[in-house]
């Protein structure tokens, strides 16, 4: 048997809007069937009975309210209306104009007014227990009661207040059950008229389960219609049943007999089933309107009505509730709201450690535990949706994610703390050794932790330096000022926005017509368009700007600082704290005294902070002991007595501590007596001259009259000084670290900049030494400086490259001059070209490229000099048969004379600069003399050797045909300075050779009057032999120029194809004498097409492949032939022989075009005699030189036309390594 306790539950709500207060009191009642349905009571109750209102078809025992007036009278009770408000509501408010109606407005439901019930003060027989709901609640007990009563059809709880809001009116009312009203005449009475009823708990539980199963079936049929806008489904209605059962506080009395319970068993069951079905329908209808409040009201109202009939069914497994554990609706609502608020705060990261309302329940409260267990399921609570619209299922998931994340963060923090604790424990003894007293000031900045940090910073700086040096090793980024990785050591590229290619598409032109695909990893092939590096918007700052930035910052710091102090290694920090180790005098307030001080002191340089701090702590300890011994501190003039000699002749002890860098007795530079002994002696003298035997204190010395200069006299000031020392030292250390980092950055930038500039200069030197196309050298250098973000300008002059590195920050430039003798080395040129392409395509760094380039420059040639002499001799031997009509007997003589020329060129000339200047002239004189001597040899009346073939073949490799070609290419590429110089040099060089050939032939003619006078070979080999000699010449000329064996196939193929075209074109032209430049242009065009296709499709070095073919095409024998004719004519004229008009034109055409020899009829001999005599004059050699220039121009046009056909748009990424 369950009984209610004698204690009362009083709920007090406070409203800030109208400052009213209401108290709900639940008094003890002897009736065990008392229902706690709250209604207000008025002190002026008219006793109106509402029993005539309609009830449901089955009469259910309806609770009634007993109104207790203020004077204790108990008027007639009125049953609670279950329908809409009647007329008595308006009558009551019409008779009480000072009362106000309180309405409950919910979405989708009409406003309902409560019936007229006056408010009054209830009589209480027992004590009162007050429950104050939490302040954060969204719904008050009045609102919740209105929801329950209105939805269940029992009426509405009305909130009333007086018009005067200044006074807080306390209204107390008592709700008691009364006998159910008699049914009206028009309605039948229910099957049970008993005033109380009660069913067994087992029946209540089974009935509740049956109702849940039927309601779930109805919910499955109306799933869509029963889901509200906030995502709350029908299942929430049933999930809350377990929680809502605890609302019911109805308990039956034990006095009721089993027979009475059995008699009432059937009728209540039927009525409860109908009531449940009605509430399910109400829930579905209200859900369709989207009204969460109405849904909750309907459910809670149904549960409240069912609880009043069932006597309080509980969840399965719950224990019997006692009257002590019974909760009011306010308590349950507060507990539910508190739990939901707590969960919402946990989800939002604002977990509250206090649960409001939890103090109202005792630990042994069984029902409270059961209710709390139900409330722990966030999904089972529908009342929470009146507070927030967050679906609890999603809320739980989010809460779990947040909890997991917090747990991970907590574990991580715990690991970090553990590591820090271990590290701190490791360094604990070091810190403890320097902190021996309670007033130790600041901790030592030279801890192991800071040393480790400095080591890490040093490592980071080294990595940064390494990365800066190899910055372009990765994809080059041109940062703007807005970028996070903006480099302060850069300056805007002045010529970037004026470039004509700024808006061009960066897609590589090599992809047009690229029929082969190769990997670009080794640098020997052209990478794809993704590797293209656009021109930089910013260039690296110059060395001068970086140095000025470094020095100006130092000077700026010194000028802005009033005190310049050097610490440690003597580096000026520029930011001097006002108090450093106590070396600067301070005022009592701690401000520094502005007076001149030495910028450098030995004391601050020798000792570190540890030693200073130990000395300072020792002084503090000594002064503490001295203070304990002498409670009364002596005055300043008493120090003279302590320093005077004692009667025994022993001077009194005087404590004077001298610490390096810490001057307890401060002095300034202007004082002549800076130490304490000086003014102590002065005080002794003053005391002795007083005449009073020391009774009158001596005058205070000037050095101590200023309060600021008084020595530190108490331990507090020493402690403060020690503290300030640590702080100032840390500040200075931070400034020093910042300065060191800045210096390291600037130093690294300067080193990196110098390394890049050095690489550019080395690359320029290598390209010039190894024979890169001179008309494209400036383009190569510009591409290299662009990729390295160096602002460089280049001007090429034959034999010299002028380089200017600009600095936009200081508007200055640094001029560099690269001078070297231009040569040809095809193997090293290919290696240099690979490095150049890898750098330009951002595949390797400057450091690696510089090392590889230095290795190339230091490396020896591929073939030794003696082997090159052999190759040179063989080359001169095979060129004579196909180019100068040489015979088989002429080949050995050409090889011998060619070896002489090769020896002087390869071995002698590089070792003697003096001889190098006259090498061409001396060799031409010697070879011409020897060749005529060999040609003069006769056997049986014939000459087995040809003077013209031997002389021209021996000098073929050193003739200026390649020089003339390079000058012509430079002029064609608008390089006017280099082209003009080189072309003029080629003409003068030709005249030098002509002079040497003429002089050699004339000298031998003077010596031998029987010298040969033939300027052509009477016989020649079959033209089919040229198929053998042309590739052989290309082979040996490539080896002389240090070509690799792997490069030879392409060279031989291209040179052979070019000569074949030239041969057949010359054979089919009617007048090849006057069209030599045409045949040369067509042959050069063929070589250019094949070489550029080899570069584009095969990704090889086009220049190296084309060079032997160009050597075959260059008119090497033009100048020698004209000079030879002039030499023979002059020699014969000197000896009186006029027969010098043999087939001159035939030999000129042959040497100019390297075509088939055109035979001249003997009938034309007299016609050509005049031309021969004219060419034999000194001006004839010059005319032939100009003929050579015409042929070179034809070759130039053919090469440029071929390049235009293969590369119509040029190459933006890297320069064309072709002619």
From Swiss-Prot:
Q: What is its main location?
A: membrane
- Segments traversing the membrane: 864-884, 888-908, 918-938, 945-965, 983-1003, 1021-1041, 1049-1069, 1075-1095, 1100-1120, 1184-1204
Q: Where's it found, cell-wise? A: Membrane
Keyword Transmembrane helix found: yes
Sorted UniProt keywords: Membrane, Transmembrane, Transmembrane helix
The biased composition feature labelled Acidic residues covers: 42-53, 159-171, 219-231
Identify the domain of life: Eukaryota
Transmembrane among the record's keywords? Answer: yes
Q: What protein family is recorded? A: Belongs to the ThrE exporter (TC 2.A.79) family.
Query: What protein name applies here?
Result: Pheromone-regulated membrane protein 10
Give the source species: Yarrowia lipolytica (strain CLIB 122 / E 150) (Yeast)
């Amino acid at each position: 048997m369950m009984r209610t306790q004698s204690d009362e539950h009083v709920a007090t709500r406070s409203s800030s809007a109208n400052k009213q207060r209401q108290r709900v009191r639940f008094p003890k009642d002897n009736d065990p069937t008392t229902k706690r349905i709250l209604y207000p009571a008025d002190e002026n109750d008219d006793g109106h009975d509402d029993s005539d209102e309609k009830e449901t078809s089955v009469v259910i025992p309806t609770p009634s309210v007993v109104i207790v007036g203020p004077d204790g009278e108990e008027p007639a009770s009125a049953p609670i209306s279950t329908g809409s408000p009647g007329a008595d509501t308006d009558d009551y408010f019409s008779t009480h104009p000072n009362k106000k109606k309180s309405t409950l407005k919910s979405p989708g439901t009409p406003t309902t007014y409560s019936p007229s019930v006056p408010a009054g003060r209830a009589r209480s027989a027992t004590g009162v227990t007050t429950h104050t709901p939490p302040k954060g609640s969204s719904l008050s007990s009045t609102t919740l009661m209105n929801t329950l009563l209105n939805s269940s059809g029992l009426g509405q709880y009305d909130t009333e207040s007086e018009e005067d809001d200044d006074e807080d009116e306390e209204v107390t009312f008592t709700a008691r059950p009364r006998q159910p009203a008699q049914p009206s005449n028009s309605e039948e009475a229910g099957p049970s008229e008993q005033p109380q009823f009660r069913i067994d708990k087992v029946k209540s539980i089974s009935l509740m389960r049956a109702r849940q199963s039927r309601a779930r079936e109805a919910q499955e049929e109306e799933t869509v219609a029963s889901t509200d806008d906030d995502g709350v489904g029908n299942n929430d209605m049933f999930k809350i049943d377990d929680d809502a059962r605890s609302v019911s506080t109805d308990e039956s009395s034990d006095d009721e007999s089993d027979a009475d319970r059995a008699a009432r068993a059937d009728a209540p069951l039927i009525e409860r089933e109908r009531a449940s079905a009605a509430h399910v329908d109400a829930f579905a209808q209200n859900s369709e309107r989207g009204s969460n409040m109405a849904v909750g009201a309907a459910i809670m109202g149904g549960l409240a009505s069912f609880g009043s009939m069932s006597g309080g069914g509980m969840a399965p497994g719950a224990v019997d509730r006692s009257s002590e554990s019974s909760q009011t609706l306010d308590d349950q609502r507060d507990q539910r709201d508190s739990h939901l608020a707590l969960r919402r705060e946990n989800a939002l990261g604002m977990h509250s450690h206090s649960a409001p309302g939890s103090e109202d329940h005792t630990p042994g409260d069984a029902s409270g535990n059961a209710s709390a267990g139900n409330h722990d399921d966030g999904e089972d609570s529908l009342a929470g949706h009146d507070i927030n619209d967050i679906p609890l299922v999603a809320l739980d998931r989010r809460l779990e994610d947040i909890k997991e994340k917090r747990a991970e963060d907590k574990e991580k923090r715990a690991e970090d703390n553990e590591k820090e604790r271990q590290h701190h424990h490791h360094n604990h003894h070091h810190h403890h050794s320097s902190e021996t007293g309670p007033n130790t000031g600041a901790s030592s900045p030279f801890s192991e932790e800071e040393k480790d940090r400095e080591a890490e910073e040093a490592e980071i700086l080294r990595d940064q330096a390494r990365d800066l040096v190899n910055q372009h090793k990765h994809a080059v980024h041109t940062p703007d000022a807005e970028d996070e990785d903006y480099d302060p050591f850069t300056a805007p590229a002045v010529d970037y926005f004026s470039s004509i290619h700024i808006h061009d598409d960066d897609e590589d032109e090599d992809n047009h017509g690229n029929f082969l695909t190769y990997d670009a990893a080794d640098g020997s092939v052209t990478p794809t368009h993704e590797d293209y590096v656009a021109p930089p918007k910013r260039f690296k700052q110059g060395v001068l700007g970086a140095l000025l930035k470094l020095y100006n910052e130092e000077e700026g710091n010194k000028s802005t600082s009033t005190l310049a102090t050097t610490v440690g290694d003597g580096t000026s920090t520029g930011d001097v704290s006002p108090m450093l180790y106590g070396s600067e005098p301070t005022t009592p307030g701690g401000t520094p005294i502005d007076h001149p001080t030495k910028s450098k002191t030995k004391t601050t340089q020798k000792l570190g902070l540890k030693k200073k701090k130990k000395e300072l702590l020792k002084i503090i300890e000594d002064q503490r002991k001295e203070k304990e011994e002498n409670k009364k501190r002596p005055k300043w003039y008493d120090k003279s007595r302590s320093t005077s000699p004692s009667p025994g002749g022993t001077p009194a002890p005087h404590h004077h501590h001298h610490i390096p860098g810490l001057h307890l007795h401060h002095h300034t530079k202007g004082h002549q007596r800076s130490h304490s002994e000086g003014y102590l002696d002065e005080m002794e003298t003053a005391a002795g001259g007083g005449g009073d035997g020391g009774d009158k204190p001596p005058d205070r010395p000037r050095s101590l009259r200023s309060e600021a200069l008084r020595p530190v006299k108490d331990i507090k000031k020493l402690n403060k000084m020690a503290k300030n020392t640590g702080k100032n030292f840390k500040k200075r250390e931070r400034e020093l670290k910042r300065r060191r980092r800045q210096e390291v950055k600037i130093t690294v930038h300067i080193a990196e900049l110098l390394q890049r500039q050095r690489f550019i200069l080395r690359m320029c030197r290598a390209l010039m030494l190894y024979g890169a196309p001179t008309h494209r050298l400036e383009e190569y250098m510009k591409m290299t400086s662009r990729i390295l973000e160096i602002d460089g300008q280049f001007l090429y002059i034959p034999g010299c490259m002028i380089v200017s590195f600009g600095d936009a920050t200081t508007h200055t430039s640094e001029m560099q001059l690269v001078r070297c003798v231009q040569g040809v080395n095809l193997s090293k040129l290919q290696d240099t070209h690979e490095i150049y392409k890898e750098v330009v395509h951002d595949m390797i760094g400057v450091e690696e490229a510089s090392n590889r380039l230095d290795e190339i420059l230091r490396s020896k040639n591929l073939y030794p000099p003696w082997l090159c002499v052999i190759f040179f001799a063989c080359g001169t031997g095979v060129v004579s048969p196909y180019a100068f009509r040489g015979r088989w007997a002429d080949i050995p003589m050409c090889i011998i004379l060619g070896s002489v020329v090769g020896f002087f060129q390869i071995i002698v000339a590089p070792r003697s600069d003096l001889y190098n200047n006259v090498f061409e002239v001396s060799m031409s004189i010697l070879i011409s003399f020897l060749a005529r001597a060999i040609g003069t040899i006769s056997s049986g009346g014939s000459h087995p050797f040809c003077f013209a073939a031997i002389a021209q073949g021996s000098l073929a490799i050193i003739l200026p045909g390649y020089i003339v070609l390079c000058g012509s290419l430079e002029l064609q590429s608008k390089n006017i300075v280099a082209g003009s110089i080189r072309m003029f040099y080629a003409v003068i060089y030709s005249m030098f050779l002509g002079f040497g050939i003429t002089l050699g032939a004339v000298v031998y003619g003077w010596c031998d009057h029987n010298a040969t006078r033939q300027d052509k070979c009477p016989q020649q080999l079959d033209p089919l032999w040229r198929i053998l000699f042309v590739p052989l010449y290309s082979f040996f000329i490539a080896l002389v120029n240090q070509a690799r064996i792997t490069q030879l196939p392409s060279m031989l193929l291209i040179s052979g194809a070019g000569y074949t075209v030239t041969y057949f074109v010359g054979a089919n032209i009617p007048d090849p004498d006057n069209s030599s430049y045409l045949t040369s242009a067509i042959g050069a065009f063929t070589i250019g097409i094949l070489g550029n296709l080899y570069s584009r499709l095969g990704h090889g070095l086009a220049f190296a492949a084309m060079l032997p073919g160009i050597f075959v095409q260059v008119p090497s024998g033009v100048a020698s032939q004209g000079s030879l004719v002039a030499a023979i004519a002059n020699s014969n004229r000197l000896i009186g022989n006029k027969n010098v008009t043999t087939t001159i034109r035939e030999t000129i055409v042959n040497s100019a075009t390297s075509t088939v020899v055109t035979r001249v009829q003997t009938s034309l001999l007299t016609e050509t005699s005049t031309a021969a005599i004219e060419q034999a004059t000194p001006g004839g050699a010059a005319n032939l030189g100009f003929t050579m220039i015409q042929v070179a121009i034809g070759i130039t046009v053919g090469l440029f036309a071929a390049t235009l056909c293969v590369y119509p748009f040029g190459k933006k990424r890297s320069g064309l390594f072709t002619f």
